[in-house]
Amino acid sequence: MTRVQFKHHHHHHHPD
């Protein structure tokens, strides 16, 4: 897993 993918894999809890 590259760093770019890791950055894109953020866990943001926000209501849809």
Swiss-Prot record:
It comes from the Bacteria. The keyword Kinase does not apply. The keyword Amino-acid biosynthesis applies. One of its GO terms (biological process) is L-histidine biosynthetic process. Keywords: Amino-acid biosynthesis, Histidine biosynthesis, Leader peptide. Belongs to the HisL family. This protein is involved in the attenuation mechanism for the control of the expression of the his operon structural genes. This is his operon leader peptide. It comes from Escherichia coli (strain K12). The lineage of its organism: Bacteria, Pseudomonadati, Pseudomonadota, Gammaproteobacteria, Enterobacterales.
